[in-house]
Design a protein with these regions (language model features):
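Sec-dependent N-terminal signal peptides
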Residues: 4-13
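Sec/Tat signal peptide C-region and signal peptidase I cleavage site
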Residues: 14-20
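Short glycine-aromatic motifs
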Residues: 20, 32-36, 84-87, 153
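Short, surface-exposed coil-to-beta transition loops
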Residues: 20, 40-44, 56, 104-113
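Surface-exposed amphipathic alpha-helical segments
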Residues: 24, 29-34, 126-157
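Signature of long, low-cysteine stretches enriched in small and polar/charged residues
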Residues: 80-118
Length: 157
């Protein structure tokens, strides 16, 4: 579990103190979420999905650069590759983009999800599912996208 948290901290960055106004921090904490990042332009928390899986949800706040959500998706994927994590594949549904990565040393798969549609303008919802399980079917990957986006949107006011 310590390795899991360490990897997530390395992937998501440092902690500060000022959550975006549209994120329901109290509800996240009441539901057992653990804060990773707390800034005015980004908020992130992790939640245990089952005994082998964690979901880290991050809200990025601000104007999107040229290229929109697709650019954010590629940027997040490329940041993780710089950390020595292997790229496996990518996909997309109507709901979001997904990138499948593998951390050889830790033996974990990371599924990075970026929601396509912004429920609130200038709030981009991302999720990283960390698990020992490998999911490859289109239905499994679609379910991961749905899980991450649904969990993220659940805590927006």
């Amino acid at each position: 579990m310590k390795k899991i948290l360490l990897v997530l901290f390395l992937m998501l960055g440092a902690v500060s103190l000022a959550a975006p106004s549209r994120v329901n921090v109290a509800k996240i904490q009441n539901d057992g979420g653990i804060v990773l990042i707390d800034k005015s332009n980004a908020y992130s928390f992790i939640k245990l999905i089952d005994e082998n899986s964690l979901l880290a949800v991050t809200y990025y706040v601000g104007e999107l650069e040229k290229g929109g959500i697709k650019t954010v998706s590629e940027s997040l994927k490329n940041q993780q590759l710089a950390n020595g994590i292997e790229y496996i594949s990518s996909g997309e549904t109507e709901t979001g983009y997904i990138h499948k990565l593998y951390a050889v040393e830790q033996g974990y798969y990371f599924y990075i999800v970026i929601g396509k549609n912004q429920k609130i303008k200038n709030y981009v919802v991302t999720g990283i599912l960390q698990t020992a399980e490998e999911y490859s079917s289109k239905n499994d990957l679609k379910a991961i996208i749905e899980l991450a986006v649904k969990e993220g949107e659940r805590y927006l006011k």
